[in-house]
Amino acid sequence: MHFSGVAFILISMVLIGSIFETTVEAGEGPKSDCKPDLCEAACKDLGKPMDFCKDGTCKCKD
């Protein structure tokens, strides 16, 4: 049971990361208040530091 919880969290992180990766690369997507903690986590999943997070856009440093 503990393992399934860990697996669920990992799968969720991958799905969230892929959504943010698409938003970061395409520069479009749902416009909403950018959440710095989610943006930073998405950039960390890509192996990059967060550059900025404003106007619903998450940008990672290259």
From Swiss-Prot:
Organism: Tityus discrepans (Venezuelan scorpion)
Stated role: Probable voltage-gated potassium channel inhibitor.
One CC-aspect GO term: extracellular region
Notes on the domains: Has the structural arrangement of an alpha-helix connected to a beta-sheet by disulfide bonds (CSalpha/beta).
Cellular location(s): Secreted
Location, primary (coarse class): secreted
Cystine connections: C34-C53, C39-C58, C43-C60
Entry protein name: Potassium channel toxin alpha-KTx 18.3
Additional notes on this entry: Negative results: does not block or only poorly Shaker B and Kv1.3/KCNA3 potassium channels.
